[in-house]
Swiss-Prot record:
This is Large ribosomal subunit protein uL14c. It is found in: Plastid, Chloroplast. PROSITE patterns: RIBOSOMAL_L14 (PS00049). Belongs to the universal ribosomal protein uL14 family. Binds to 23S rRNA. InterPro entries: Ribosomal_uL14, Ribosomal_uL14_bac-type, Ribosomal_uL14_CS, Ribosomal_uL14_sf. The keyword Ribonucleoprotein applies.
Amino acid sequence: MIYPQTMLTVADNTGAKKIMCIRVLGGNRKYGKIGDTIIGVVKEAIPNMPIKKSDVVRAIIVRTSKTIRRADGMYIRFDDNAAVIVNMENNPRGTRVFGPVAREIRDKNFSKIVSLAPEVL
């Protein structure tokens, strides 16, 4: 569950290292799950990269440390909360995605993120 003020690691090579969620998009939602879009502010960034500290960005949640239950009864949980920074068309701004992503990303039609990911769980 990703609430406003939650810190997430960035799982791509855009230059941002950590973002803080400031809004979960989609109506009057209190928290975000895997596959949801959030608005975040960059809190840590690598120098001389396209995304700078204090930039406001859109991101897709790809990993959460909260256990989620799948339709087949299996439970899955990750070690961290992570997101991939996207543009307004929901295409990733980076060219690489680090770490595994959940299968729910594919179900929500973020196929470009899935194709860049090294592993889909």
